[in-house]
């Protein structure tokens, strides 16, 4: 596999930005592309530093693109940058043009952990027709729950005001359950893999989200096992997620 630090200009962000990329080496062409999203304290290279994602991608002849979004919660910020537009509209197009990877709906996947799990779910629930599958690990599934935890933290309140606005209103486009409620049962249903450790502080949110997804989508696999909110769990979960959502004919022996 080839590992690339990709620096490029983003028109939507109006600046240069970064992504870490894992690609099958020449002459192999990737069969699918995964946009893999970092958590709140992470960066574009964190998945590669903390897991064996390169080895897992090689088993599936998979291209993995890990973008940088700061602490934006994968949102078009009220007082900040349009990171959701960047992830959903711009990044796939730039990846196809520059890296020559497949980004059509049959071959594009998105996944992430914690804040990135929220971002991955938000991508697919906003645009279910654009993705073949979603991997959500230890996701924060309720922004409202997060806001309750920061009521006495001025620093985080300011951070969230930049994201949501001064009144901290969670609009439907940032509410996973509101997005899910809008969806009519799609003809081509994306596949979902949801996992969380049973000792994770976000455990109940993953359980509830998986149950809600199963009411709308045909292919939703939920797994749990003993674990907390850490890389031990996520390194074990990401290869299981790939096996769950990728087409069977393209999985490793």
Regions found by a protein language model. Name each.
Residues 1-253:
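Non-catalytic cap/lid and distal C-terminal segments of serine-dependent acyl enzymes
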């Amino acid at each position: 596999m080839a590992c690339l630090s990709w620096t490029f200009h983003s028109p939507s962000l109006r600046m240069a930005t970064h992504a870490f990329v894992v690609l099958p080496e020449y002459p192999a062409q990737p069969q699918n592309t995964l946009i893999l999203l970092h958590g709140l304290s992470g960066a574009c290279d964190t998945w590669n530093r903390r897991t064996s994602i390169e080895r897992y991608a090689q088993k599936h002849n998979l291209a993995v693109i890990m973008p940088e979004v700061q602490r934006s919660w994968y949102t078009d910020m009220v007082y900040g940058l349009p990171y959701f537009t960047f992830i959903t509209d711009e990044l796939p197009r730039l990846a196809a043009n520059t890296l020559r990877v497949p980004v059509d709906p049959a071959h594009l996947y998105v996944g992430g952990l914690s804040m990135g799990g929220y971002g991955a779910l938000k991508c697919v629930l906003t645009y279910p027709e654009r993705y073949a599958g979603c991997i959500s690990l230890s996701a924060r599934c309720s922004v409202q729950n997060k806001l309750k935890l920061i009521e006495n933290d001025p620093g985080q309140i300011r951070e969230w005001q930049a994201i949501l606005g001064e009144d901290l209103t969670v609009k439907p486009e940032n509410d996973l359950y509101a997005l899910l409620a809008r969806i009519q049962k799609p003809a081509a249903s994306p596949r979902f893999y949801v996992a969380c450790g049973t000792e994770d502080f976000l455990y109940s949110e993953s359980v509830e989200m998986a149950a809600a997804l199963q009411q709308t989508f045909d292919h939703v696999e939920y797994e749990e096992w003993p674990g907390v909110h850490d890389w031990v769990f996520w390194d074990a979960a990401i290869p299981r997620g790939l096996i769950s959502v990728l087409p069977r004919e393209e999985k490793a022996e």
